[in-house]
Structure formats: C-alpha cells, structure tokens
C-alpha cells in the first residue's frame, strides 16, 4: 500500500462538498472567461483569430485534471487515507492518456446543440439506424443512481441551480466524460451517432474529439449565436452543417 502524503503532493482524503463546488465554480468561471476572450460574438475585426488547437487542448487537459481531482475527493463515508500503488499509477496514467475511445472513421458522429430530439431526428429524416444521445439525460441518470461516484456532485449542483438548469453548470469536461462512458459501454464500430444538446462550448467539443472520437460534423441552426465559438472553429475545418 502507498500512503499519499506530502511527498507526492496528493491527498486522497475526502473534502467538503462546499470546497468541491468552489473548485468547480472557479474552473467553470475560468473556462467561461477564456471562451469570452477567445470568441467575441458579433465582432467584425479582421484581427480576430481562432486559437490554435494545441492551446485549446491544453486547457482541456488542465480542466480535466482539476475536475478529476475534485470529483474523486467525494466520499460520503469515512476518509480514505491509503491507496494502493496500482491505484495511484492507474490514476496518473489515466490523466496522461490521450488515446480516444474510437479510432477515426470507426464510428460516424454528429454533434448538435439543438435540445429537442424530435427536431434533431427530423434533420436526419428519422433514420432508424441512428443512435441519439443526450448528455443531459445521462447526467440525470447518474444523479438518480446513489451508487455512482458522481451522484453527490450532481445533487449539489441541483441544489444550487435546480433540476432544469444544472446541466448548463456542469464542471468542465463532465458532459463529454459521461457521453464517452456511455458510448464505450453501448456503442460499437460502424454505429452512426448523434450527440445532441451538446457541446456547451468549444472546450467541450475539443475534449470530445480528443478523448472519444473525431466527429463528422456539427449541425446547427443558421445564425445561431449561442455557441458562436464552436461554429467559428468548425467552420475553419468545414465541419459545420447549417440548417
């Protein structure tokens, strides 16, 4: 057994939910500020440039690490003072892993911020072979599962923002993480998938492509300004389908 102490700089004991939410809020605030600085909606200046993929990916790595440490600190029973060496190594290797769940072209994935699944299905002509995934519904399933390690975090978000709005306040990376976890267990090579009500921002979209799969396109309403940063970015790689 390996005791996590001052030498490793990691404490495996539980932290209070208040501290967890504070960490999450700071992280979301930082991501929000980055989005506003990087993508100023409606700006006509010719000097506006889309940040490089590497910079956005770096934000994703840092955000994922902070979110992971916050979520893993939840323990409603007694603090855990020891972890095995294997557990520690698994955590660290997981943070360094940059291999996506699906290889390029292994699955066909479309993203869409449109929330109404009926409208989304209509866009794809009610294709019976298409799999439709809503990360908000996945989050709700997790919230109602007392055995899921992320249930306490989601319950705290509901207390603060309500059941109708807490999805919009998920910590950075959680929507993509829940989607990836579901797809890993339920999807296979050759599947055609629409992840709707997603992404919430450009960072989530980049995280999705880094850790889950390269997407085919993103389907949005024409002139939709709600996720302008996402649209601007994917227009540069010709992956936007406007309707």
UniProtKB/Swiss-Prot annotation:
Record's GO cellular component terms: mitochondrial membrane
Residue range covered by the transit peptide: 1-39
Keywords carried by this UniProt record: Membrane, Mitochondrion, Transit peptide, Transmembrane, Transmembrane helix
Main location: mitochondrion
Compartments (UniProt record): Mitochondrion membrane
Residues spanning the membrane: 50-66
Membrane topology listed for this record: Single-pass membrane protein
Family recorded in the similarity comment: Belongs to the AIM36 family.
Protein name from the UniProt record: Altered inheritance of mitochondria protein 36, mitochondrial
Originating species: Vanderwaltozyma polyspora (strain ATCC 22028 / DSM 70294 / BCRC 21397 / CBS 2163 / NBRC 10782 / NRRL Y-8283 / UCD 57-17)
Annotated gene: AIM36
């Amino acid at each position: 057994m390996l005791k996590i102490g001052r030498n490793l700089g990691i404490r495996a004991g539980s932290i209070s939910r208040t501290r967890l939410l504070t960490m999450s809020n700071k992280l979301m605030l930082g991501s929000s500020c980055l989005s506003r600085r990087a993508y100023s909606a409606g700006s006509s200046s010719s000097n506006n440039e889309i940040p490089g993929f590497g910079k956005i990916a770096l934000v994703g790595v840092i955000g994922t690490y902070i979110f992971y440490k916050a979520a893993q600190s939840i323990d409603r029973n007694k603090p855990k003072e020891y972890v095995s060496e294997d557990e520690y190594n698994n955590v660290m290797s997981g943070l360094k892993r940059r291999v996506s769940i699906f290889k390029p072209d292994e699955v066909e994935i479309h993203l869409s911020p449109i929330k109404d699944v009926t409208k989304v299905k209509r866009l794809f002509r009610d294709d019976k072979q298409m799999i439709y995934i809503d990360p908000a519904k996945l989050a709700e399933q997790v919230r109602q599962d007392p055995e899921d390690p992320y249930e306490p975090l989601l319950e705290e978000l509901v207390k603060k923002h309500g059941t109708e709005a807490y999805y919009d306040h998920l910590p950075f990376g959680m929507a993509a993480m829940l989607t990836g976890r579901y797809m890993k267990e339920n999807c296979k090579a050759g599947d055609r998938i629409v992840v709707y009500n997603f992404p919430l921002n450009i960072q989530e979209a980049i995280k999705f492509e880094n850790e889950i799969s390269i997407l085919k396109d993103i389907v949005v309403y024409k002139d939709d300004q709600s996720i302008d940063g996402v649209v601007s970015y994917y227009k540069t790689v010709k992956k936007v389908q406007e309707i």
